[in-house]
């Protein structure tokens, strides 16, 4: 039977930082169930914070804090030490190191990571762009794209487009289907901005089969036929070569890893 650990996440903002760290840590413990349903964002009152910490003691929970307010963080730390509560402060030890190195204090303003600045609105615009020019719906958008993703069905074009859009990049994508002519505008796109996505045929067949299963479609079709998939991938590689696209094999890469490679590629263009 797997062990279970209850985790409280406390923040004076959204608390996204602790969630990202927790996801990375929990992945290293497949035999432990982490109950992370106890999330407490926008905490700004001392008594409210203490009530949460008292409940954490009752649940024998681990408390992860991203409180930036120095007074609240001190209250939480002192309470936890006095009551033997497992408490992890993700912010203030980092602040102390920076102050030691630079002599500079943090501004201690919650939510500055999520402020509505030009970067935020650029990201929203990029997401709208990715949706508008998804799946080759409007090929003229290729000319305004930071990146154009090319690939056969189920090579992660759409999720990769949205992921990169969340980083502010304008991304469009085009599904490659041997029977469907390529849009002429593709010839006008800077080849350095073309990324061709491929996947090992056997893995792609499994991904497609899983997709059909999720839709309640179990009948064998050419969509999952291995020979047909080989033909599609051969066709896609011909297209990549013709237009000078950089090729990335998605077989053993996550969306995040692939996005990193694309970002590194983009940096070389600027």
From Swiss-Prot:
Q: So which domain of life are we looking at? A: Bacteria
- Keyword Cell membrane tagged: no
Return one GO MF term.
Answer: ADP binding
Q: Does the keyword Transferase apply?
A: yes
Coiled-coil annotation reads none
Q: What is its EC number?
A: 2.7.11.32, 2.7.4.27
**Role description:** Bifunctional serine/threonine kinase and phosphorylase involved in the regulation of the pyruvate, phosphate dikinase (PPDK) by catalyzing its phosphorylation/dephosphorylation.
Q: What is the name of this protein?
A: Putative pyruvate, phosphate dikinase regulatory protein
Name the source organism: Streptococcus gordonii (strain Challis / ATCC 35105 / BCRC 15272 / CH1 / DL1 / V288)
């Amino acid at each position: 039977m797997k062990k279970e650990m209850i985790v409280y996440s406390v923040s004076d903002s959204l608390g996204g930082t602790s969630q990202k760290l927790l996801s990375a840590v929990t992945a290293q413990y497949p035999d432990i169930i982490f109950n992370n349903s106890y999330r407490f964002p926008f905490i700004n009152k001392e008594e409210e914070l203490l009530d949460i910490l008292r409940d954490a003691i009752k649940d024998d929970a681990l408390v992860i804090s991203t409180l930036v307010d120095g007074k609240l963080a001190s209250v939480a730390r002192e309470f936890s030490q006095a009551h033997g509560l497992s408490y992890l402060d993700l912010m203030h030890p980092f602040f102390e190191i920076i102050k030691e190195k630079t002599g500079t204090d943090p501004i201690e303003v919650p939510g500055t990571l999520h402020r509505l600045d030009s970067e935020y609105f650029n990201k929203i615009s990029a997401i709208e762009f990715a949706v508008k020019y998804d799946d080759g719906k409007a090929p003229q958008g290729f000319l305004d794209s930071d990146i154009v993703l090319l690939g056969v069905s189920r090579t992660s074009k759409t999720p990769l487009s949205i992921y990169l859009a969340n980083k502010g990049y304008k991304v469009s994508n085009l599904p490659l289907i041997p029977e469907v002519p390529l849009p002429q505008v593709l010839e006008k796109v800077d080849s350095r901005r073309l990324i061709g996505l491929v996947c090992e045929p056997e893995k792609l067949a499994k991904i497609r089969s899983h997709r059909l299963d999720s839709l309640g479609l179990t009948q064998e079709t050419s969509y999952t036929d291995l020979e047909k998939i080989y033909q599609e991938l051969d066709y896609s590689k011909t297209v990549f070569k013709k237009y000078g696209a950089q090729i990335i094999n998605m077989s053993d890469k996550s969306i995040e890893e692939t996005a990193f490679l694309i970002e590194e590629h983009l940096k070389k263009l600027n």
